[in-house]
Design a protein with these regions (language model features):
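ATP-dependent carboxylate-amine ligase catalytic core
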Residues: 21-108, 124-126, 132, 154-155
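Walker A (P-loop) phosphate-binding motif
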Residues: 1-34, 39, 112-114
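Aromatic/hydrophobic pocket-lining residues that form π-stacking "cages" and hydrophobic walls in ligand
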Residues: 15, 79, 160
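Short catalytic-loop micro-motif centered on adjacent basic/acidic residues
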Residues: 1, 70, 147-150
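Active-site catalytic microenvironments for nucleophilic, acid-base chemistry
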Residues: 18-22, 82, 215-219
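A short glycine/serine-rich beta->alpha loop
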Residues: 64-69, 197-203
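Short glycine/threonine-rich catalytic loop with a Thr-x-Gly-x-Asp
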Residues: 26, 200-212
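Acidic, Mg2+-coordinating active-site environments of NTP-dependent enzymes
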Residues: 87-94, 110-196, 209, 213-218
Length: 219
């Protein structure tokens, strides 16, 4: 279960690539989509068909019986129904907005949680300060569940650490419990493990790929 401001989609893409390369079937739920709505849901590696997604949304609308529901909530319900009906080994789940009240946080016992870099975003919903925003995202952490933390500035890191302590989560932080850096044409994880450079462009992808490796290590 992945929250954060920047790098959620990239980190999930790296995790999916590693899991599939190892022979695992991964369901994926991300947002927003770039071109087509069905890009948000992958079932065991394949994009859900538009027809299947439309049918799932109709089922969810019927089950909801006219109660108030948001666009993201009904899409999340459709994704979860699709996941329940299709065999796979793992679900990679991205928060849509914040974390504390996000529809994806209905998952009570995730295998692990991850928080990518936190910065100012969605202030009208999450709060006016970096600490408030970090607190909303840090609320995905669960008792007894490892929380893998990406690169953070001081304020978000302190909030995440405090929230983890209050919730009984186990922290696995970048530059504390694990490291990722570029050395020549390799990504070096924990100072000794060498990987090819990420296929996605930008120096920030070193940290995103490092987070993905740290998550896979803890699964």
């Amino acid at each position: 279960h992945v929250a954060g401001t920047n790098g959620k989609g990239s980190s999930i893409a790296f995790m999916r690539a590693m899991l599939e390369a190892a022979g695992y079937r991964a369901h994926v739920y991300t947002s927003p989509h770039l071109v087509r709505f069905n890009e948000r849901i992958r079932l065991a590696g394949e994009l859900i068909s538009e027809a299947a997604l439309s049918a799932l949304l109709e089922d969810c609308e019927t089950a909801n019986r006219g109660d108030s529901i948001t666009y993201f909530e009904i899409t999340t319900a459709a994704a979860f129904k699709a996941f329940a009906e299709t065999p796979a080994d793992i679900v990679l789940l991205e928060c849509g907005l914040g974390g504390r009240y996000d529809a994806t946080t209905v998952v009570a016992h995730p295998a692990l949680t991850a928080i990518t870099p936190v910065s100012m975003d969605h202030m009208q919903f999450l709060g006016d300060t970096l600490a408030e925003i970090a607190g909303e995202k840090a609320a995905i952490q669960k008792p007894g569940v490892v929380s893998v933390i990406g690169a953070q500035t001081d304020i978000p890191l302190r909030v995440i650490e405090d929230e983890a302590s209050a919730r009984g989560a186990s922290l696995h932080r970048m530059d504390v419990e694990w490291t990722a850096s570029r050395e020549a044409e390799h990504l070096v994880f924990d100072g000794v493990r060498r990987f090819p450079l990420p296929g996605l462009p930008g120096p920030h992808q070193i940290a995103n790929a490092g987070l993905a490796i740290a998550c896979i290590d803890k699964l």
